[in-house]
Regions:
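Short, low-structural-confidence N-terminal segments
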Residues: 1-72, 166-225
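Acidic/polar surface patches and capping/hinge elements
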Residues: 125-130, 140-186, 196, 212
Length: 225
């Protein structure tokens, strides 16, 4: 799962089910527009492998329900990734070499067991680590910029321990008001905005929100104490 998974899968499923499971009548029905590009139901459809995998987790849901949940989640991911990328581009947010190297050193520690794995060629593994490092450093830098611009709640998520969900909400609302994206299907629309506006049970105390250093550097420092 990527850093655009703002809402945990099970919570997202609960939202969708509570709103009612309805899919567009036609498989190619246009359900949203994102930066002047139409998004059809067809392009959001999950693979059968993904349906089977998540149905093994959401055991009380039918295949149809799981497929709908994944389709709506795919739309949320597409909007999230595109809006965050646009925000980063407009604000010229890119990690510097030191930030990427810092992330790389941590990722190398996390993946040290792969060094002796014959399934991974040395050069291929290094490209993977560098790509992961760049993505992680940029994600932290975008989160930092969003929090500094909008404030709001920050929560822990597996792929981003400092996820500024309050800032996400304000950013998405601004992009919606500017017409940068619109969701036509009422159920998709309700599910997306319910997930964006979700109130988390556990949020960081404002005094403990610190973007002065990348979160992985602080974690490593704490582990060494």
């Amino acid at each position: 799962m990527t850093r655009s998974n703002v809402i945990p899968m099970v919570l997202f499923a609960a939202i969708v089910i509570s709103l009612g499971i309805n899919t567009p009548q036609a498989a190619n029905e246009i359900i949203a527009r994102l930066f002047n590009k139409s998004i059809s139901n067809t392009e959001l459809q999950p693979s059968q492998a993904d349906v089977d995998r998540f149905q093994s987790i959401l055991t009380d849901k039918s295949e149809k329900e799981v497929r709908t949940i994944l389709t709506q989640r795919a739309l949320g991911n597409k909007i999230t990734e595109s809006v965050l990328a646009d925000f980063a581009d407009k604000n010229a947010i890119e990690p510097n070499e030191g930030e990427v190297q810092s992330a790389y050193s941590v990722i190398k520690l996390w993946t040290v067991d792969l060094d002796g794995n014959r399934e991974f060629l040395g050069e291929e593994l290094e490209r993977y680590r560098l790509a992961m490092a760049h993505g992680m450093a940029k994600s932290w830098k975008v989160s930092k910029a969003l929090y500094e611009a909008y404030g709001g709640d920050v929560v822990f998520q597996q792929d981003n321990p400092l996820t500024p969900v309050g800032a996400y909400q304000q950013l998405f609302e601004q992009y919606r008001e500017k017409g940068e994206f619109v969701i036509y299907d009422p159920v998709f629309k309700a599910a997306f905005w319910s997930s964006v506006k979700m109130k988390y049970a556990k949020t960081y105390d404002p005094d403990n929100i610190d973007f002065s250093l990348p979160w992985w550097e602080k974690s490593m420092t704490a582990a060494e104490k």
